[in-house]
Amino acid sequence: MHLSQLLACALLLTLLSLRPSEAKPGAPPKVPRTPPAEELAEPQAAGGGQKKGDKAPGGGGANLKGDRSRLLRDLRVDTKSRAAWARLLQEHPNARKYKGANKKGLSKGCFGLKLDRIGSMSGLGC
């Protein structure tokens, strides 16, 4: 296992082991939330009998828009953090490129990589 993967796993475990009440002692504990897709579906199902022009009693239409925008913002943050974790844990796409022969001081043959190519073309190699 690579060192970066090991560190990422350790960091993830420490973050998961913290509970919201431990992280912020002054904040009240959060209640379990339903998935955002279900939260978006519930207001639509509850207000299904109303038309677009109708307003909810008590000015609830503005609050509904605020709830939807908050939910969409939460979804965006979640996907950004997932993408960041995926990039962190993913192997570098050109990992072969950075291994072995491209390091200075390492040579594949008796005269070094460049001279070996010249020697193989001219027949002067070892």
Curated annotation (Swiss-Prot):
GO terms for cellular component: extracellular region; extracellular space; protein-containing complex; secretory granule. It holds the Pfam family ANP. InterPro entries: C_natriurtcpep, Natr_peptide, Natr_peptide_CS. The keyword Oxidoreductase does not apply. Residues 20-71 are annotated as: Disordered. It is found in: Secreted. One of its GO terms (molecular function) is signaling receptor binding. Its main location: secreted. Coiled coil: none annotated. One of its GO terms (biological process) is negative regulation of cell population proliferation. Disulfide bonds join C110-C126. Residues 24-73 form a propeptide. Residues 1-23 form the signal peptide. Keywords: Cleavage on pair of basic residues, Disulfide bond, Hormone, Osteogenesis, Pharmaceutical, Secreted, Signal, Vasoactive. Residues 26-35 have a biased composition (Pro residues). Residues 46-63 have a biased composition (Gly residues). Belongs to the natriuretic peptide family. This is C-type natriuretic peptide. It comes from Homo sapiens. The lineage of its organism: Eukaryota, Metazoa, Chordata, Craniata, Vertebrata.
